[in-house]
Amino acid sequence: MSGRLWCKATFAGYKRGLRNQREHTALLKIEGVYARDETEFYFGKRCAYVYKAKNNTVTPGGKPNRTRVIWGKVTRAHGNSGMVRAKFRSNLPAKAIGHRIRVMLYPSRI
């Protein structure tokens, strides 16, 4: 069995008020989640923004490649339509808005 261990999500933007945006919290739209009560399953799940950079870097136990990852965690729901808030180790870059975020199906809380 080799399937995906992650769900597809889209980085919709940063948490914001009318005039200020808070870049330390990202808003994610998870595919197939359309109500606030459905988001509870994803609380505490790890999420990752995977991207390609210009230069190779060495990963422990692997070959040098251009792939990089920013890790984060889903923290809570945002609104009533299935959006969630996530905090990343370093803030997501603005160029990531509209791009794919992987929401891992671990750690399990069941």
Swiss-Prot record:
Family: Belongs to the eukaryotic ribosomal protein eL33 family.
Protein name (Swiss-Prot/TrEMBL): Large ribosomal subunit protein eL33
InterPro entries: Ribosomal_eL33, Ribosomal_eL33_CS, Ribosomal_eL33_sf, Transl_B-barrel_sf
Gene3D superfamilies, per the entry: translation elongation factor selb, chain A, domain 4 (2.40.10.190)
GO molecular function: structural constituent of ribosome; tRNA binding
Keyword tRNA-binding attached: yes
Localization of this protein: Cytoplasm
Pfam families noted in UniProt: Ribosomal_L35Ae
Function: Component of the large ribosomal subunit. The ribosome is a large ribonucleoprotein complex responsible for the synthesis of proteins in the cell.
Domain of life, source organism: Eukaryota
Gene Ontology biological-process annotations: cytoplasmic translation; ribosomal large subunit biogenesis
Principal localisation: cytoplasm
Subunit field text: Component of the large ribosomal subunit.
Keywords: Cytoplasm, Ribonucleoprotein, Ribosomal protein, RNA-binding, tRNA-binding
Gene Ontology cellular component terms for the protein in this record: cytosolic large ribosomal subunit
